[in-house]
Amino acid sequence: QDRHADRRPFLLARNRIKAAIRAWFEAEGFTEVEPACLQVSPGNEAHLHALATEIAGPGPAPTRRYLHTSPEFAMKKLLAAGEEKIFAFTPCFRNREHGPLHATEF
């Protein structure tokens, strides 16, 4: 059995739900933003653990970056810069969270 065929109804339902939510936000005057997933710092939340990655470059050593645990900080910077009504559909990543109630990416 094709795994994609089994999941297709969920993909289509998710797409319809996101489209309806997006349409509501746009009708209310919100702007959709795409905050960067990679950041310089893992964050200050002691109970959240960011996933680290190494970015290879022309320099002698790779650069360490972290996948965000939440888009909140990036979105707050946009609000501080003058944006008033924003929303985002973006994945979040948390290390050490995996089980029946938690996923590393959500």
Task: Locate predicted features.
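Class II aminoacyl-tRNA synthetase-like tRNA-binding/catalytic domains
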Residues: 1-106
